[in-house]
Amino acid sequence: MTRCGWHTCTRVRPRMGETLLPRKASQHEFEPEEIRMKQEHTECPLLVSHNGIIILETFTANAKQATDFLIAIAEPVSRPAHVHEYRITPYSLYAAVSVGLTTEDILSTLDRFAKNTVPDTIVRFVRECTLSYGKTRLVFKGGRFLVEAATREVFDVLTGDAEISRLRAAGTVRDADARYVFEVRVDCIEQVRRRCIEIDYPMIEEYDFRDDVALRSLDMDLRDTVSIRTYQEVSLNKMFGNRRARSGVIVLPCGAGKTLVGITAMCTIKKPCIVLCTSGVSVEQWRQQVLAFSTVSADAVSRFTSERKEMFEADAGILITTYTMLAFSGRRSAEAQRVMEWLRGTEWGLMILDEVHVVPAAMFRKVVSAVSHHCKLGLTATLVREDDKIEDLNFLIGPKLYEADWQDLSMQGHIARVECVEVWCDMTAEFYREYLGQDPRRRRVLSIMNPAKFQTCEFLIRKHEALGEKIIVFSDNVLALRTYALKLGKPFIYGPTGQTERMRILRQFQTNPAINTLFLSKVGDTSIDLPEASCLIQISSHFGSRRQEAQRLGRILRAKRRNDPGFRVYFYTLVSKDTEEMYYSRKRQQFLVDQGYTFRTVTALEGFRDTDVRVFRGKAEQRELLATVLLASEEDLESEESEDGDEAAADRRHLRTRGGAEDTVPASRTRTERHLLFRKMHKRHRR
């Protein structure tokens, strides 16, 4: 019998909107309770509310230990300087037990740090979630898929279930640790997993890579000159426990070394690895860093992109490709089809999903199930989307294993300190008159091409170039991108730019002292490593996407000079006054505000009035620019599509709603599409 990963041979796929957590947790109702403060409450860092909200005072004596504990059991909501807000959810408790915490561990530690008596409804909620969580594990071991039960009672519940019994393989065995174990058929793994959720015993997925002798080992270690930081080590310890590899997601800020975490995971497992990226540029950068940080040979690292279709010849190796290459369902070239057949026929010990927040999008959902693999590691800086589909990661990949605090890493010098500035640009009278009478798409482009915004962008570029800094300018709209870049004489990269040309422009930006400004479309949002950049100017964006705001900020967080005394990077957002841009700008900033960043609003830049700006100063030039927008085709008015197809669709619906064309709930699912857990949660929030 040919072995294969559980995602290749399954016959039943998970349905959208399916409950991902046990019924007990999803049906729990938080009951209001009076807060009862302890006598020694001033010395304790936590205030625990009856609705699952936990407030952390960062200035108390035990704040550091309490923070480490909360990261393990709760979801961070907001983390400004002195007071943090967390929320306990079924997902966060699922993640807690997956890394070894027990019910009593959670309750006793929560009580020790709490200012008040932990509400009874929270105690019941934790018990309901955790008493059955972590009691079953799906383990790939010795060429078989085994379900391990923690106790005889749990074993009897599982084997006594009619549906699970039907899906079992012949025979029941005990492993060396005397756990109760039974084997399940390879083609039924997903059905068993879903059934365990339905009967209140969600499984933790693990890969016993040390005892996997069937898969050839990969000769790969970290180079002696490479050292990992403390927070990277902590995140990896969450993944590798009990001498096995857990599937899950690690959340680190942009520039904090997510790639090195992934490479270290490869070196630990030492089995064939497949890495999924968002673009061809990130494929090249992943390959460069794998070879720079590890001892693996170049022949063992292959690429599968539109321009390179390689297959390593060794028994074990690394394949780096893009989500799009795997998700493509159209006709392929003979060469690409040959690589796809080889890829599908190969067993992968580890699948790394870079920028994992894109995986739940409609075009990528099938990627995870297209390849035979035994362990999944998701990497991202922003576990947030505008369409609620981030919830699906718990089903597609696994629980969140670790999430770092952006401000902590900034204070330690691991990522740069940032000054965030929102610059309000007056609309010229002629542009604003047309803005009021146009359809939503053309209004949006008019606000982007506002001559005052053009002049502000030119002023900021000249100012920071004079300081010897490298500048990135972002625009989602391609018409604006080309117009700005060509008018200011700067290079630009967008969707149609070929892979070879992209790499050439990026190299010039990094190494040529004469090329100090680069214009990027959405293709630069993620996975492009430009540590030379220390200033970012955003002239247009993707509606209210919090994820995109954080990803773009991340392009300058890894600045090489971040540890220089007094050094900081600059993040400018240019907004046309009295337009929809002002509404969306506030929405976009929310994630970064929750991470402790502050935005300074400026209506007049210092020195701007005294500077001889060169672009669109005359009325004739401004009218010509206005005519360009008014005569632009519908295609030119569209923003460039991103990988987050579903998120983009949600925000377009929102734009139409605000324009009066459609009556929909913006960026959300219908009630029936939500997981049961979240239907109840949203109902409570509405009340």
Curated annotation (Swiss-Prot):
Keyword Nucleotide-binding: yes
Helicase C-terminal domain location: 455-609
Its EC number(s): 5.6.2.4
Residue spans of biased composition, Acidic residues class: 636-648
Cellular-component GO terms for this entry: nucleotide-excision repair factor 3 complex; transcription factor TFIIH holo complex; transcription preinitiation complex
Domain Helicase ATP-binding: residue ranges: 239-401
Ranges of Basic residues composition bias in the record: 677-687
Name of the protein: General transcription and DNA repair factor IIH helicase/translocase subunit XPB
Species this protein is from: Antonospora locustae (Microsporidian parasite)
